[in-house]
Amino acid sequence: MSLLTEVETYVLSIIPSGPLKAEIAQRLEDVFAGKNTDLEALMEWLKTRPILSPLTKGILGFVFTLTVPSERGLQRRRFVQNALNGNGDPNNMDRAVKLYKKLKREITFHGAKEVALSYSTGALASCMGLIYNRMGTVTTEAAFGLVCATCEQIADSQHRSHRQMTTTTNPLIRHENRMVLASTTAKAMEQMAGSSEQAAEAMEVANQARQMVQAMRTIGTHPNSSAGLRDNLLENLQAYQKRMGVQMQRFK
């Protein structure tokens, strides 16, 4: 799984199901594909979204700022700064500084995520705030590791509050990952289709997958329901890849 796919999976796992989730998923895909380069307009759009908690908006704003190239002097947004101040708790700030020093030494995504997971959500948010406010710099990979650790903690607490049985992998994250991978695979199919004889069929399968993912995000479904989506898609993809003679990305 690529780094950006992983980031998209974790970020989307903390957003409540509904039309807005499908819209945010599309924005993230566009940003990661380099199709949306207007950071100012993106932040203005994010600021006015309903439903999202201030912290979720702060995390999304942080991810957009990390990813979209912008002019150096571009103003930092107050709604992101307020969300990433660790509730104004000095303890959170102290821990955030300690974490930041550790993240400076981590250059990999997984290393940073591992280190960050041992801190509280408040400390993690404060640490993002430090980086967002240009008070410190870490590698983009380390910053994304910090983002995913924060999302994992939020998703864990949401999952516990759903009173579902905890498994080794968080079902909300696993569910979102299946949907992100379905979208990614659909995109890959469209690109590969080209002018081959099976192009129309490939586009049809990809389109069905995309519509299904969008519907599931809009309506909201039980975390286990995406397993069916995965199985249906796999059947279609395996039939398609036999004819194309290629190996498609497998689902987890």
UniProtKB/Swiss-Prot annotation:
Subcellular location as annotated: Virion membrane; Host nucleus
One Gene Ontology cellular component annotation held by this UniProt entry: host cell nucleus
Region listing for RNP-binding, in residue ranges: 165-252
GO molecular function terms noted in the UniProt entry: RNA binding; structural constituent of virion
UniProt source species: Influenza A virus (strain A/Chicken/Hong Kong/96.1/2002 H5N1 genotype Y)
Cysteine disulfide links: none
Protein origin, superkingdom: Viruses
Keywords linked to the UniProt accession: Host nucleus, Membrane, RNA-binding, Viral matrix protein, Virion
Family according to the record: Belongs to the influenza viruses Matrix protein M1 family.
Motif Nuclear localization signal per UniProt: ranges: 101-105
Name of protein: Matrix protein 1
Main function: Plays critical roles in virus replication, from virus entry and uncoating to assembly and budding of the virus particle. M1 binding to ribonucleocapsids (RNPs) in nucleus seems to inhibit viral transcription. Interaction of viral NEP with M1-RNP is thought to promote nuclear export of the complex, which is targeted to the virion assembly site at the apical plasma membrane in polarized epithelial cells. Interactions with NA and HA may bring M1, a non-raft-associated protein, into lipid rafts. Forms a continuous shell on the inner side of the lipid bilayer in virion, where it binds the RNP.
Additional observations: Most abundant protein in virion. When expressed alone can form virus-like particles in transfected cells.
HAMAP family: INFV_M1
Gene Ontology BP term (one): viral budding from plasma membrane
